[in-house]
Amino acid sequence: MVELDWDALSEFVDGMWDDSALPDLYRFIEIPALSPAFDADWNANGHLDATIDLFTAWLATVPLEGLSVNVHQLAGLTPLILCKVEGTAPGEVLFYSHLDKQPEFTGWSEGKGPWKPVREGDWLFGRGSVDDGYGGYAGIISVLALQQQGIPHPTCRFIIETCEESGSPDLPAYLAECKDDLGTPDLVIVLDSGMGDYERLWITESLRGLIGGTLSVAVSAEGVHSGMASGVMPSSFRIARQLLSRLEDEDTGALKPDWLHIDISDELRADSQRICDVLGQALIDDFPFLDGVEAQSTDLVEALLAQNWRPTLSITGAGGMPALEQAGNVLRTH
């Protein structure tokens, strides 16, 4: 049995990452490959296809034995990559990642931007490299590192989609289409989650899940002067607040429906305490609070449970609210 040389493995992975993966991630950042939910013209724009082309071109440069690559695109659906690396040991592993991106947003630091790769020390700034462009590169390099030392490995497959940020609506069709090619994985590795620090490998055991929706409140067919209409016509903003208050306690942030909550077991609390023992105050202090803003809980265990196990309402956007410089004395229609 070949013994793994950890020092050599680390040196090889670091070299491959710096010399091969990072230059590609720079190019990946430059592609505004918004997920279909944020780009209705994604097919015509071709940015998702560009990420597919970029990654498959990189794969062609990697001396990985037993590698086969297939790009799938069903009619009207986003493209998907399916790779297979033949195993030299029993077992099957499935790696998952995605190449589509969230919208670019605003507020980037001076000299940085969503489609402009900037490296400062160990940090690479730009949209999508962490969520989730790195995933395929990291997985492929990990298998290559084993081959480089002659270490037997199981058959490894990689499924890389381009609509995850839209809720993966196209993925089920591809899972059915590629069923015979996906095998029967003994282990699924999803390289698309967070971590506590850079000193150890973190495993995500559970995600809270997400229910997304759009709340619309309309009160009039056209804008009317607020001085004339307020007090007679209801405020769409007030109605929205009332509806949100059915769901969320505005004083505490706690969500009201019982069905959104789970019982926090003693085991979960004990696990959370162990994590807090490792990470300490960084659990809270790593967030960019403004001066005077306090965390909702200063108890580390309670903060961790709230972050990972308790439901929360997050409002991520609003329409129908004019910018301040355009907000005249007009009652909003919606």
What are these regions (language model features)?
Residues S129-T298, E302-L313:
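Fold-level recognition of mixed alpha/beta catalytic cores in primary-metabolism enzymes, strongest
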Residues L34, A75-L77, T162-S166, D263-S265, ...:
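Short, internal active-site loops enriched in acidic
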Residues A303-N329:
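A structural supersecondary motif
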Residues E30, L34, W115-P117, S216-E222:
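Short connector loops/turns at beta-strand edges and beta->alpha or beta->beta junctions
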Residues V232-M233, Q326-H334:
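Short, solvent-exposed beta-strand/turn "edge" segments of beta-rich domains on protein surfaces
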Residues V2-G107, T333-H334:
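N-terminal helical capping/dimerization or prosegment-like subdomains
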Residues P90-I160:
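Active-site metal-coordination/substrate-binding segment of hydrolases
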